[in-house]
């Protein structure tokens, strides 16, 4: 404990507790330290002592920390802490700071030396830039169900690293977001009910194996974001619950302690030792595993005292409000600590309400995140896509309302795992109609998503044209790639993702009106929207998306500048499963025909249930009137 800052631990500002607490090798053995302030006694138990609580008692130090050293142990030996409560009850607890753990159904911690991995991502780390004005196309992955062995076994971290990094890079994703890999006991929780906040789940291998996973992603230029869950923890006896016989990590107040809807406990954000535990966990993943960001789960449940609670089940804060002031302070401290570790980190909030200033700096009164999932856009789009195209005209605002607030925060547009489970249908399954209409609907939607302001996230499997919902206990329907239509869908994803990555107009100005302009926002009868994306350096892309099964050969609208427009991408391309009959094969020239309140306009072809992207080139002088032409083309 020579370098341990007890004041920082108590005060809730420590970010490196994992270097002291937990189990660490010494010249003479392994030293164990655990925080159990209410315990009557604590000992270390394991296979090495036949789990005898009397074999290796620990001595109590300042701050409720217990310590002992045991000789003759080896890496991977299993252990727990035998914690005796004031009542005399003894519970065997996993180490909250363990680096490694048994694979379920085992619940013991394992000795592990974290040092020694030889990283090869130095060039990637040196080239990192802030996320704001660069492309971010995220492939969300559940490692256990992306792909399985023929016998149903999981792939390990190293095999996943090799295959997934190649696959994601080939498909045009430059980031993967992992559903939680912090150790968890129940597969059905998908990782969102954790027990090990410092241990990558042993389902897929060791800590060094997970380091290899991140390393290989980085070597292929792919960032890695981890879902991280500070909102609640599971109630398994070997975990954090009532750690020393009384609430330690959770609130003692019964009106704050339980999250009844999830059957979990809520962290005590007002207790310094708990804040330090969580801050150290976040910093640990960023620092020791070179992760590029954390997506913080269920932020709304942290911010509101009445979240999931009825009247009488919660107590107002000192100001009489329903905000959890301690959680607000914690989130600000979390983001401050994360940016201290990595100034280019991505701190992403899953916040489902209209809480203000989520992605504003702490110094400006914000929570300090730099990205936030746009749940409103996601809900509107999922509702819209399920509608029969004839009814979509009555819900056109679902397409356009997001631009009323698109620049109020730094948004990520998510089509996440939550939208393809619990009878919600896969992305393709949300679309009405036959196979052709469903796949065409996916293509048009993906163009809309990738060209709409904001960073992007798509859950695995959409690129296969998968019909079935996600099944965490299986794998993606890879067999679909035996079908021509599904291969073409995957080819489309590859092409449109790569197009996004290589065109700055689609990402350089994602959080300001300077990067976006509506050309047609109110054509509800045709289920069509048209807009321009700009990069601020003269490049313009015109995007037209048609959510109707009717194609348009001469769709006219006003344009702000006199340019020639050339089609660069069409969802009707035969390579993607389209018909090839609805293309803008020739350059489209601006004409001196007023439309939509503008002096000049163009007329283009838009495929049924399709989308086109055209690039503008050249700005022209106003032409002289020519009486011989009713529709005068501006010179090229």
Report each predicted region and the residues it spans.
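Carbohydrate-interacting/catalytic domains
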Residues: 1-136, 144, 157-172, 436-439, ...
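Short, flexible loop/turn elements at secondary-structure junctions
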Residues: 36, 62, 72, 142-147, ...
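Glycine-rich, histidine-containing beta strand-loop boundary motifs that form or position
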Residues: 46, 70, 83, 179-182, ...
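Short glycine-biased active-site loop of nucleotidyltransferases that positions the nucleotide triphosphate
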Residues: 59, 187-191, 235-242, 359-360, ...
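Conserved alpha/beta catalytic core and glycan-binding cleft of carbohydrate-active enzymes
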Residues: 104-105, 290-292, 307-475, 480, ...
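Substrate-binding/active-site clefts of carbohydrate-active enzymes
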Residues: 124-133, 142-323, 587, 604
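N-terminal cationic-hydrophobic initiation segments that often serve targeting/anchoring roles
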Residues: 168, 214, 286, 335-339, ...
């Amino acid at each position: 404990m020579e370098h341990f800052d007890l004041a920082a631990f108590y005060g809730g500002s420590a970010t490196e507790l994992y270097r002291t607490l937990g189990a660490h090798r010494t010249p003479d053995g392994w030293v164990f330290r655990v925080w159990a302030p209410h315990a009557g006694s604590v000992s270390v138990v394991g296979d090495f002592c036949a789990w005898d609580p009397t074999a290796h008692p620990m001595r109590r130090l300042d701050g409720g920390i217990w310590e002992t050293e045991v000789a003759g142990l080896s890496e991977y030996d299993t252990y727990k802490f035998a914690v005796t409560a004031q009542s005399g009850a003894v519970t065997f607890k996993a180490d909250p700071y363990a680096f490694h753990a048994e694979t379920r159904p085992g619940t013991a911690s394992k000795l592990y030396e974290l040092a020694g991995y030889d990283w090869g991502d130095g060039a990637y780390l040196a080239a990192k830039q802030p996320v704001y004005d660069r492309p971010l196309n995220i492939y969300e992955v559940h490692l256990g169900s992306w792909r399985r062995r023929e016998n149903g076994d999981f792939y390990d971290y190293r095999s996943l690293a090799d295959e997934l990094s190649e696959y994601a890079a080939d498909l045009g994703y430059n980031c993967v977001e992992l559903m939680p890999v912090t150790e968890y006991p129940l597969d059905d929780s998908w990782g969102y009910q954790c027990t090990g906040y410092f241990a990558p789940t042993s389902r897929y291998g060791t800590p060094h194996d997970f380091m290899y996973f991140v390393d290989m992603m980085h070597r292929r230029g792919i960032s890695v974001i981890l879902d991280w869950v500070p909102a609640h923890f599971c109630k398994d006896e070997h975990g954090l619950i009532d750690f020393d016989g009384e609430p330690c990590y959770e609130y003692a107040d019964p009106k704050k302690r339980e999250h009844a809807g999830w059957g979990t406990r809520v962290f005590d954000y007002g207790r310094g030792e708990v804040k330090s535990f969580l801050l150290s966990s976040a910093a640990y993943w960023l620092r020791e595993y070179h992760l590029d960001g954390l997506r913080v789960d269920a932020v709304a449940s942290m911010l509101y005292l009445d979240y999931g609670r009825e009247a009488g089940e919660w107590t107002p804060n000192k100001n009489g409000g329903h905000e959890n002031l301690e959680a607000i302070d914690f989130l600000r401290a979390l983001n401050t600590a994360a940016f201290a570790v990595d100034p280019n980190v991505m701190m992403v909030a899953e916040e489902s309400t209209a809480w203000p200033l989520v992605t504003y700096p702490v110094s400006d009164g914000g929570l300090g995140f730099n990205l936030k999932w746009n749940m409103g856009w996601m809900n509107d789009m999922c509702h819209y896509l399920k509608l029969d195209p004839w009814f979509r005209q009555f819900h056109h605002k679902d397409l356009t309302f997001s631009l009323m607030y698109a620049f109020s925060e730094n948004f990520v547009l998510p089509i996440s795992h939550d939208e393809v489970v619990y009878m919600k249908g896969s992305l393709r399954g949300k679309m009405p109609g036959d196979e052709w209409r469903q796949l065409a609907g996916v293509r048009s939607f993906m163009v809309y998503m990738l060209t709409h302001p904001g960073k992007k996230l798509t859950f695995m499997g959409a690129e296969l044209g998968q019909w079935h919902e996600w099944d965490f206990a299986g794998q993606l329907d890879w067999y679909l790639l035996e079908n021509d239509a599904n291969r073409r869908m995957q080819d489309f994803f590859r092409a449109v993702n790569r197009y996004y990555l290589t065109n700055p107009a689609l990402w350089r100005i994602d959080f300001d009106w300077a990067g976006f302009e509506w050309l047609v926002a109110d054509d509800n009868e045709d289920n069509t929207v048209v807009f321009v994306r700009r990069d601020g350096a003269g490049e313009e892309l015109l995007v037209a998306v048609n959510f109707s099964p009717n194609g348009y050969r001469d769709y006219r609208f006003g344009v702000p500048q006199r340019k020639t427009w050339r089609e660069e991408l069409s969802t009707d391309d035969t390579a993607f499963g389209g018909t090839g009959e609805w293309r803008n094969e020739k350059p489209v020239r601006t004409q001196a025909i007023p439309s939509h309140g503008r002096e000049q306009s163009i007329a283009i072809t838009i495929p049924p249930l399709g989308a086109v992207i055209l690039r503008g080139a050249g700005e022209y002088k106003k032409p002289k009137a020519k009486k011989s032409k009713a529709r005068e083309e501006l010179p090229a």
